């Protein structure tokens, strides 16, 4: 069975950007995995509020909504890495690369979808760059 990996920066990126594609490949019987790099919420709050229960609850809700949406589309393998939203530029690129490389080694996808290199969101561009690095021929 063919395997497809979708890599998104935040919860909702994959289902909003590729929902139709996911649904089609799922209906065709492909094995689909989704990797979400950042938690998708903390960047929306002031620095003083980032470690509050409100933020933690918001993160959990976003993850649950993402999981529910992806299950409707036929995805059962979803991994959240929980890196800081809106701040992937302060995370060592090597760490993001490793998360993606580990998922590729584990899942062994034949096709990978991710963000565009010209996306306006900086987290999206960083995930694109890390995906490009993680999929270089010398990586495997």
Question: What do these predicted ranges mean?
Answer:
Residues 82-84, 114-117:
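Short, well-ordered beta-to-alpha junction loops that form the rim of enzyme active sites
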């Amino acid at each position: 069975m063919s395997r497809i990996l979708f890599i998104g920066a935040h919860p909702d990126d994959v289902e909003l950007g590729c929902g139709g594609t996911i649904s089609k490949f799922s209906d065709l019987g492909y094995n689909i995995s989704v990797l979400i790099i950042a938690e998708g919420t903390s960047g929306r709050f002031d620095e003083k509020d980032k470690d509050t229960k409100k933020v933690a609850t918001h993160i959990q809700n976003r993850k649950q909504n993402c999981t529910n949406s992806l299950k409707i589309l036929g995805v059962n393998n979803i991994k959240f890495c929980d890196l800081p939203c809106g701040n992937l530029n302060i995370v060592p690129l090597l760490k993001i690369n490793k998360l993606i490389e580990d998922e590729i080694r584990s899942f062994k996808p034949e096709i990978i979808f991710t963000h565009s290199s010209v996306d306006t969101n900086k987290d999206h561009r960083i995930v694109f760059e890390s995906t490009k690095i993680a999929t270089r021929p010398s990586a495997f």
